């Protein structure tokens, strides 16, 4: 009986470590911010192009027409969709998949190097 409890505790500790690693890996995902508004056919097209990459970043959409986003509206009102990766400008108008791939790979390598 004691052996079983010890194994259960060991399994629980292993599971906790796995969950901690999973949550750490989620934190390591870069944030791709999409500055958008409705309607925006180019934004819809961009989201389709991004589908194959969806497990490699967290997509955050910012509606530039909302009052709290007026700064972004003034900056990007004629240029949406605009993309930032981890807060840095990446591209606008259309998804450049080679640029996106290059930047994602670079960030993924940085994460691997720190682990």
Curated annotation (Swiss-Prot):
UniProt keyword Membrane present: no
The entry's keywords: Disulfide bond, Electron transport, Transport
Disulfide bonds: 40-43
Domain of life: Eukaryota
Signal peptide limits: none
InterPro entries noted in UniProt: Glutaredoxin-like, Glutaredoxin-like_YDR286C, Thioredoxin-like_sf
UniProt cross-references to SUPFAM superfamilies, sorted A to Z: Thioredoxin-like (SSF52833)
Family: Belongs to the glutaredoxin family. YDR286C subfamily.
PANTHER family according to UniProt: GLUTAREDOXIN-LIKE PROTEIN C5ORF63 HOMOLOG (PTHR33558:SF1)
Entry protein name: Glutaredoxin-like protein C5orf63 homolog
